[in-house]
Structure formats: structure tokens, C-alpha cells
Curated annotation (Swiss-Prot):
Pfam families: SFXNs
Protein's UniProt name: Sideroflexin-3
Keyword Mitochondrion assigned: yes
Subcellular location: Mitochondrion membrane
Spans through the membrane: 146-164, 174-194, 226-246, 266-286
Catalytic activity: L-serine(in) = L-serine(out)
Length: 321
């Protein structure tokens, strides 16, 4: 077997990101919870394989599949800009197990005010860790911005949950089960724009098809943030809509009436099953490298791009996660 060639582009995902299927395969790999079980030595080995390959040194005996596996293990644990190891619960591979536990508990303990407040706070604390761990190198999050987004999202989620809880007191019990979803949706609408407020102020980098940076656009930032909010809300729908319907039916059966302690683990399991599919599929709704027509950009940036290259009609940007 010959040595692996050096022309494999491991800077980009393995699968075609212009198709939904290609993006889905990419995110199924990125969010794979099994990556959390890898030891520090395994993570370092993957980092060495990737960094050596990028430097033009091929690890002896490695296959293309092993190279791609090392790339995804490396990406799952290390920050792409700083190279620092991301805290365990801040990694994309922790999304399913962490959200499974938190969402399952939000859906189980939705009746009493103290537990509603507690689990909404836990959820927003986890979101803050994820957002900080995956912050952009171009537009870093300051501690003040993180704190503002955290407090605002937590307040918004708790206020929505308690307000709707009060309004649904006299409605069928099934309606009350959907209050946590409304709170999470409201929090996403607050948290993500605040967390990325610097992008809304100065814009995000836009580039041509070859990756040549052309400037910064607030319009592109707004479009990217909107797409992320939609993805996050869609991600929560299956996990926060399907289990309540199933649990509402099961709790009327004698089996669960005699074993009420089974309610929480059963709900967490149902949420986990939904999230295993919803997380990667909803991350794949929009291309990571999104596009926008030059005609929709700010007049100054539009003029600047036309001056550099009048033939450019579409520019690209990283929408974030």
C-alpha cells in the first residue's frame, strides 16, 4: 500500500456541503456522542495526525478513512481558531446527552414553579457554556456580552415559562406540557442575537467562492443569525413535542400509574431518541458556508466588491452554529 497523498482537503468537511444529505452526514459525525468517551491520549493522537498532515507529514501506514476519522475527532474536541481543548460539556458531541437530560427534566418537572425556574436556569447555563466554548475567532465573545446574553435569555425563558404556566392553568393538562418548548424558543430568540451582538454591530466576514475575504457585512450577519435561530428552534421541536404526546397517553395507563418513578427516565429516553436525529438534521437545514447575493448587501460593501471584481454576484459567509 502506497503512502497517502497530501492533496486531501481536510480543511473542509468530507461530504458535499451543497446538498442536505452531505451536510446531514457531516453533522451526524460531528455530534456523535461516542467521541466523549475518547481518552486524552486518543485525542492527542488525532491532533498529531491532523497537524502533521497539514504540515505535509503523513503518519506512516495511515489510510484515508483513518485520516478523516482523526480530523473529525480533532474537530470535536479542539477549538478551530485557538486550538485549545474545549471543555467536555461544551463540545458538539455533548449536545445530545446533555440536551437529552436537561430537556427530559424540563418536560417532566413542568408543574411546580421552583422546578420550572431551576431547569430553565440549568438549560441557559448549558447554552452559555456551549456558546462560549464555540465562540468565533473573528468576533470573540467578551465576558460582559456573555453575561448579558445569559441573564437576558434566562430571564426571558423563565418569564415565558411562568407566564404561560399561569395562562394554561385552566386548559387541558396536555397544553401545559408544551410550555417548556415555548420557553426554549423564546430564549433562543433572545440568547443567540445577544451572544452574537458584535456581529450585528460590525458584521461578519464575507468572501468569494475561492475564500478571498471581501469585507464585513451586517446584512449577512442578520441572515446567518436568523438561520441559526430557526435551526435551534426546529431542533427542539421533535424532542419537546413528541415525548409530551406519548407521555400524556402512557401516564393514563395502569403500568405507569403503578410505577410513577418510571416517568422521568422514560421521558429522558424518548427525548434522547428524538435528539439523536433532530440535532444533526436540523444543523444541516442551512449550509454552514451560506451565500447571499451582492445586491442584498450594504451599498458601501456592494460598491467595494464591484470595484474589486464586477463579475462577483454571490458572496459566502460562515453562518455559525
Amino acid at each position: 500500500m502506497g503512502e497517502l497523498p497530501l492533496d486531501i482537503n481536510i480543511q473542509e468537511p468530507r461530504w458535499d456541503q451543497s446538498t442536505f444529505l452531505g451536510r446531514a452526514r457531516h453533522f451526524f459525525t460531528v455530534t456523535d456522542p461516542r467521541n466523549l468517551l475518547l481518552s486524552g491520549a486518543q485525542l492527542e493522537a488525532s491532533r498529531n495526525i491532523v497537524q502533521n498532515y497539514r504540515a505535509g507529514v503523513v503518519t506512516p501506514g495511515i489510510t484515508e478513512d483513518q485520516l478523516w476519522r482523526a480530523k473529525y475527532v480533532y474537530d470535536s474536541a479542539f477549538h478551530p481558531d485557538t486550538g485549545e481543548k474545549v471543555v467536555l460539556i461544551g463540545r458538539m458531541s455533548a449536545q445530545v446527552p446533555m440536551n437529552m437530560t436537561i430537556t427530559g427534566c424540563m418536560l417532566t418537572f413542568y408543574r411546580k414553579t421552583p422546578t420550572v425556574v431551576f431547569w430553565q436556569w440549568v438549560n441557559q447555563s448549558f447554552n452559555a457554556i456551549v456558546n462560549y466554548s464555540n465562540r468565533s475567532g473573528d468576533t470573540p465573545i467578551t465576558v460582559r456580552q456573555l453575561g448579558t446574553a445569559y441573564v437576558s435569555a434566562t430571564t426571558g425563558a423563565v418569564a415565558t415559562a411562568l407566564g404561560l404556566k399561569s395562562l394554561t392553568k385552566h386548559l387541558p393538562p396536555l397544553v401545559g406540557r408544551f410550555v417548556p418548548f415555548a420557553a426554549v424558543a423564546a430564549a433562543n430568540c433572545i440568547n443567540i442575537p445577544l451572544m452574537r451582538q458584535r456581529e450585528l454591530q460590525v458584521g461578519i466576514p464575507v468572501a468569494d467562492e475561492a475564500g478571498q475575504r471581501l469585507g464585513y457585512s451586517v446584512t449577512a450577519a442578520k441572515q446567518g443569525i436568523f438561520q441559526v435561530v430557526i435551526s435551534r428552534i426546529c431542533m427542539a421541536i421533535p424532542a419537546m413535542a413528541i415525548p409530551p404526546l406519548i407521555m400524556d397517553t402512557l401516564e393514563k395507563k395502569d403500568f405507569l400509574k403503578r410505577r410513577p418513578w418510571l416517568g422521568a427516565p422514560l421521558q429522558v429516553g424518548l427525548v434522547g431518541f428524538c435528539l439523536v436525529f433532530a440535532t444533526p438534521l436540523c444543523c444541516a437545514l442551512f449550509p454552514q458556508k451560506s451565500s447571499i447575493h451582492v445586491s442584498k448587501l450594504e451599498p458601501e460593501l456592494r460598491a467595494q466588491i464591484h470595484e474589486q471584481n464586477p463579475s462577483i454576484e454571490v458572496v459566502y459567509y460562515n453562518k455559525g452554529l
